[in-house]
């Protein structure tokens, strides 16, 4: 809402307060003033001139030579390029020495040999935005009314000496979508009174019912419809002050009738519509829901197809307006209009919102209906419009109002105690202070022993309950006066849940292990949604996606991590190690919330470790990633409960992929990207993993129990076992541990060999076994006994032989 | 004999002096103190001396041996030291060459901000509540005093999946769910961090996915002044001890009264700069007293219980704190961006 500071003074005395100060006060009290626009863009020395003579410039077709009276001394000669300049006009003249926007100084000049002592200005040249200039003056100079006083300051007449406050209104303050509403707010803030416009309505002795009747068939959509007839209007420009105020408020002037409806819309917040009575096509107005497929051509010359969800104003047969949004072209007021039917109605916001949405058509009117107008002022606004049309369009107001009124206006009464106000706010405001604030708001109230009974005026539709009153008191009392305290009451210790605490440790571990935390989007496309997923479900699609790329909820974190790796690689960041913790979404069926499961995933590619001058360089490989995961499982106390199983999974290298099992249940995978997928994402050799984080973090783990530090020496024996090449180390190791019994404490692999020195199809794996008894020193013999059992076991189970 | 001994001592000391390495020194030792050395020989000749002379001469021999021995030891220590120094000199390295790098990743900047905020509120007795990102319309809107048909819940602004299910547009549904779980009994003291979604085109200042942190306290006798005190405490811990806050009246459907909360500019201290656009204040939070409808819908008696709620955007805080100019950075995962947050 744009509020002209000059115009606002019609309703509230602003003596002693500048526009800037006013803006600060309004902002502090709750409505943000986004900007204060100074309308004068540096213009000086522009006055009203009277064009006494105009003739063709002798040397230029497109120039006129004018003799202009500017109210000082002899009339001056001015050369003017505007096509519409004519003898007898009152125009804006920038005198010699004047300044126009952009610090453009007007000097005495010779144009094609003719002297020019100033410049006749268009509105644009004075700094008015083109979209606000009346259409008839769009390409020429602005012509003032004939009574404009010669020599007067043109800026003042055009309100270009004004300042405009732009209010950013929250949806609850629709009351301030009108000058009167703003005046009430300002009056409350400043503690001053409001002057409402006086309406001098002179009706003739005809009866409006002889001209028109009104019927509303959709009363819920339209509880109040009122109208008046103004006869014998003469379409022409509206008074200059009205045009100037409309332009200040950001509305382009058209003609007197249309300008008056717009002026009332701004003044009262009540949208009006003026129909050409003679073009209505009947003597009745019927308000109803549109029929499916019915059409209307609106004022913007667009044909719109309607549905039963839209409300229309009809002449009993066909629509003449899309209610509350825009009038129809068929009944539009035009230059030939003589008799006007003015509509003032109260439409349901939701109904109007539907039409706005369906037709992508938002207007000053629809905005106000959507947010809610004050129905108690509807008829007053209608009267004021009729009175102005009589005054400024030479019309004659037909006696009476036609209306269909099922509106039930009930006073909103709120009762609240002083104690409650202070208890909620934590303040010690006095009874007198509350009374003062309510008085300034011009709320009617009674007070009895600290209990206030308040009747809320109909313009403040946002106030209905105690808390609303508390807010009014708080904002006008001033939040700066609110003390700062801390809650009193039982203090609970704050802490993370075990899951949250472990999740933080997982993050920190992975970061200390060299991975960076990524956060990627949850929405993806259909193809990527299920790629790599540990569990898959029906894809969950948005009803109205903004793009195909962000239309489905992900079931794995890996695809977007691959995109991130690819994004980096495309920017010459080749070495990437990222992890993400985030949700995947598994459908549970229509209208059920999906299962949201937290996953941990990672992507690693490029060089893992490089210390080049010492000759160290290591690319990421399967075992780098596995090592990181092993560390993670150890961190969580799960190292002995996790297994890796060779696996084949879609999109992964068939020979370099493992499924990860926790307590024999699959909880994730790690593997190298399949070359085809690698290519698809434009990556080099890349490894990925994804784990069910909830399974990892929710599993019960024993608390740490101290075990005695070894007091006796341990004995280490190494063996190299030759086995068939398909035998996997993990199985071999498991067998060794089993056979080694209690005395075998550690088994580690220190060599793997495959090659010329072994028969075809064989490999050798070397293990180091450490034996230890916490109670005593082991003898060589005892160890040998166990060790031989171990060797026997692997011989029997795997056909392993000792490598010579 | 005496002269002979003095001469031997003289000779030996000179040779010790001349010895350049441990081997040469050892040769001197063997030559003079060895069993076949000249001093032993002198000792053997002592039999020819008179009993009076013998102890005198014996003492003299010992003195000479002692002197040579001492000289040998001293020289040995010097030579050994020299040897060590030589070895160390040969072992010198260029300490300016780079060390073996330790690979280290780090938190995403949003996590950094979120964890810092979480910890501040945990310190004030809050717990962290989490909830689903795919939500029922009821918890996302209705339970928060946004009934059906309310303009703020337009299909155009939210990602709906069905008419009743959508991607949550704020973390407030977690508040509604948590209150419901409390079955009308306070106190409730939570903060809710999480991802939220809005139907916005991604650009420098908008992202269809972003994060929020909201806080909620419900108990008997919670006052708006408690909200102010709590947020002032938060602002000071988060942005510096000399920060102040101010409330500006505002509107949210789920709180009444509602306020926007500004923190005095941590860049200029409130004098006005480009971070605070010359105002000295930076808008950080939205807050207010929980609307009685919200309390009642969650099963709390709004006559007995009051509460406050607040919400903020980690993206905005991170952007202000670190001077980040484009919200898309948070979701591109460019390592050149992420790596900048790798220190205290």
UniProtKB/Swiss-Prot annotation, chain B:
Biological processes, Gene Ontology terms: phenylalanyl-tRNA aminoacylation
One Pfam match: tRNA-synt_2d
Reaction catalyzed: tRNA(Phe) + L-phenylalanine + ATP = L-phenylalanyl-tRNA(Phe) + AMP + diphosphate + H(+)
Stored PROSITE patterns: AA_TRNA_LIGASE_II
Cellular component terms per the entry's GO annotation: cytoplasm
Alphabetical keyword list: Aminoacyl-tRNA synthetase, ATP-binding, Cytoplasm, Ligase, Magnesium, Metal-binding, Nucleotide-binding, Protein biosynthesis
Sites where the protein binds Mg(2+): 256
Cofactor stoichiometry and binding remark: Binds 2 magnesium ions per tetramer.
Record InterPro entries: aa-tRNA-synth_II, aa-tRNA-synth_II/BPL/LPL, Phe-tRNA-synth_IIc_asu, Phe-tRNA_ligase_II_N, Phe_tRNA_ligase_alpha1_bac, Phenylalanyl-tRNA_Synthase, tRNA-bd_arm
A GO term, aspect molecular function: tRNA binding
Subcellular location: Cytoplasm
The name this protein goes by in its record: Phenylalanine--tRNA ligase alpha subunit
